[in-house]
Amino acid sequence: MTARRVLNPVQRVAIFGGTHGNELSGVFLVNHWLKHGEEIARPGIEVRPFITNPGAVEKCVRYVDTDLNRVFDSENLRNENNLNLSYEVKRAQYINSIFGPKGSEDAYDVILDLHNTTSHMGATLILEDSKDDFTIQMFNYIKTSMAPLACSVLLIEHPRLKYATTRSIAKHPIGVEVGPQPQGVLRADVLDKMRRIIKHALDFINYFNDGKEFLPCILEVFKVLDNVAYPRNANGDCTAIIHNNLQDQDWKELKPGDPMFLTLDGRMIAYEGDCIVYPTFINEAAYYEKNQAFTTTQKMTLCAQAIRCTEPK
């Protein structure tokens, strides 16, 4: 007999835009849905669009004091020293009070957090838990619905890299990352891909609540391995740029010996790892301040059990 998980119906969904204030697809879509909610309405489900970082949105910057998408850990969410808290930590506590508390039964069922990247990643879904059958099933549905358009899945489960994302307060946190799009700019093709992803995600939830059983599935994902830094000299100055052979090659294999960086005097720096990796977030503008040239991933397959709703509508 096929193993099956019987899960509670999804009652509350949030759609976050503006976690980074200069990633405009999510900002524009959420502001549109705040005025025209019929597009995202689904029977029996509360769907709430929400601008997470209005201070950054107003200034069209990534953040005001610190990255909102990295402060949703227990230390920041419980910090009561109001006089010294950054703007984003205060926002995190406020958001947690509305959509959380994180890790509790009162937290929202699903949060869809909308992001743009300057990297050539296309449509990307971000998974936080490799054992979350509900989200894996949703991603499989979205990928199938988006075909033939590619829709990659990035798994950010990692023993050392702790993300503490804005969406992590939900029972099922979902990142939506679409690019390439410059910061502070809107592109119609990028916005359309993001809009379609949200439609398919909400449709999946609606079908699930209606009693549709989703059979066991497998999902190809790219699991985060490490972040690769730019070469720097003793003074901390960047001494090389992304090699042209690597530029815009997100999700494609990088083999040992392949060109990785190019110095300004024309010297090629090769990838010296011991296995094939799949880079992503290549030359992401927002990560220059983090000295992060790209992220390496490994390709793997996840399996999800069949799921159905305990109390179909």
Curated annotation (Swiss-Prot):
<keyword id="KW-0963">Cytoplasm</keyword>
<dbReference type="GO" id="GO:0019807">
    <property type="term" value="F:aspartoacylase activity"/>
</dbReference>
<feature type="binding site">
    <location>
        <position position="115"/>
    </location>
    <ligand>
        <name>Zn(2+)</name>
    </ligand>
</feature>
<comment type="function">
    <text>Catalyzes the deacetylation of N-acetylaspartic acid (NAA) to produce acetate and L-aspartate.</text>
</comment>
<keyword id="KW-0539">Nucleus</keyword>
<keyword id="KW-0862">Zinc</keyword>
<feature type="binding site">
    <location>
        <position position="287"/>
    </location>
    <ligand>
        <name>substrate</name>
    </ligand>
</feature>
<dbReference type="Pfam" id="PF04952">
    <property type="entry name" value="AstE_AspA_hybrid"/>
</dbReference>
<dbReference type="GO" id="GO:0016788">
    <property type="term" value="F:hydrolase activity, acting on ester bonds"/>
</dbReference>
<dbReference type="InterPro" id="IPR007036">
    <property type="entry name" value="Aste_AspA_hybrid_dom"/>
</dbReference>
<feature type="binding site">
    <location>
        <begin position="69"/>
        <end position="70"/>
    </location>
    <ligand>
        <name>substrate</name>
    </ligand>
</feature>
<dbReference type="GO" id="GO:0005634">
    <property type="term" value="C:nucleus"/>
</dbReference>
<dbReference type="Pfam" id="PF24827">
    <property type="entry name" value="AstE_AspA_cat"/>
</dbReference>
<feature type="binding site">
    <location>
        <position position="177"/>
    </location>
    <ligand>
        <name>substrate</name>
    </ligand>
</feature>
<feature type="binding site">
    <location>
        <position position="20"/>
    </location>
    <ligand>
        <name>Zn(2+)</name>
    </ligand>
</feature>
<feature type="binding site">
    <location>
        <position position="23"/>
    </location>
    <ligand>
        <name>Zn(2+)</name>
    </ligand>
</feature>
<protein>
    <recommendedName>
        <fullName>Aspartoacylase</fullName>
        <ecNumber>3.5.1.15</ecNumber>
    </recommendedName>
</protein>
<dbReference type="InterPro" id="IPR050178">
    <property type="entry name" value="AspA/AstE_fam"/>
</dbReference>
<dbReference type="GO" id="GO:0046872">
    <property type="term" value="F:metal ion binding"/>
</dbReference>
<comment type="similarity">
    <text>Belongs to the AspA/AstE family. Aspartoacylase subfamily.</text>
</comment>
<keyword id="KW-0479">Metal-binding</keyword>
<keyword id="KW-0378">Hydrolase</keyword>
<feature type="binding site">
    <location>
        <begin position="163"/>
        <end position="167"/>
    </location>
    <ligand>
        <name>substrate</name>
    </ligand>
</feature>
<dbReference type="InterPro" id="IPR055438">
    <property type="entry name" value="AstE_AspA_cat"/>
</dbReference>
<dbReference type="InterPro" id="IPR016708">
    <property type="entry name" value="Aspartoacylase"/>
</dbReference>
<feature type="active site">
    <location>
        <position position="177"/>
    </location>
</feature>
<feature type="binding site">
    <location>
        <position position="62"/>
    </location>
    <ligand>
        <name>substrate</name>
    </ligand>
</feature>
<dbReference type="GO" id="GO:0005737">
    <property type="term" value="C:cytoplasm"/>
</dbReference>
